């Protein structure tokens, strides 16, 4: 903010200067410094509507591998009970060389249900 104030101080000097070349050079310098500030401040934004090329290169630089395992045993039946079990696990790894970050996620879930027939309960 301090450098912006320093530029604003010199605007009246350049605007009311007798030489037009000083005015043009100063306005060109002011415009270029403003454009450089905009490009630096928005270079980290990955919005696709503002920077489509940077967002596409960012999505192509991700190397991801995922593996998943799922088993569902619903049809195994015994004489006195039916066992339903389901388990799944998935892991994924994503690496971005642009931002030097590695993101890993691992999740597992399992569910088992023991369904005892009504006739077995009545016999007990």
Curated annotation (Swiss-Prot):
Residue spans crossing the bilayer: 27-51
Subcellular location: Membrane
Key words of the record: Membrane, Transmembrane, Transmembrane helix
Membrane topology qualifier: Single-pass membrane protein
Stretches for region Disordered: 53-110
Primary subcellular site in the record, as a coarse category: membrane
A single GO cellular-component term on record: membrane
Top-rank taxon, per record: Eukaryota
Comment field (misc): Almost completely overlaps SAS3.
Name of the molecule in the record: Putative uncharacterized protein YBL053W
């Amino acid at each position: 903010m301090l450098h912006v104030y320093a530029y604003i101080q010199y605007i009246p000097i350049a605007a009311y200067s007798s030489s037009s070349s000083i005015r043009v050079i100063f306005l060109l310098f002011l415009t270029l410094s403003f454009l450089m500030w905009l490009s630096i401040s928005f270079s980290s934004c990955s919005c696709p509507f503002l920077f489509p090329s940077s967002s596409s290169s960012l999505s192509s630089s991700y190397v991801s591998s995922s593996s998943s395992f799922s088993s569902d045993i619903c049809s195994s039946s015994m004489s006195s009970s039916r066992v339903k079990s389901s388990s799944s696990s998935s892991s994924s790894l994503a690496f971005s060389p642009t931002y030097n970050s590695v993101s890993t996620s691992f999740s597992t879930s399992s569910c088992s249900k023991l369904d005892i027939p009504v006739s077995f309960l009545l016999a007990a």
